Amino acid sequence: AGVPVVVISSYPAGDADSISRSLVIGPDDNRSTDAASKREDRAWLFELETELAAEYDEVSVFDPYEVLCDQSVCRIAVDGTEYYTDTNHLSKAGSLLLAPAMAEILGVEIR
């Protein structure tokens, strides 16, 4: 038995136009992007990660899509709260949204 390893899969990239617009004119209440296209963009990588986890008992995969997306959309902002600082970085609110699910897979308690 080895050391437990958690692979943190990529999260859906934010929409550049939407994020830029919110910086110029202020945040919109709710913004999202198409979940199917975002999942397709990273399908090859997620398949590789899940195959790795299936091959090794000590490896598990944390999938941010399970928190940030539903079947149709990936949320960029909800009720005026921005989940991204730019297309590639989560905001503090976005990170805090992922925290409970990450804590669960890591087996730690959030204080």
Feature-to-residue mapping (PLM):
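Extracellular glycan-modifying ectodomains
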Residues: A1-R111
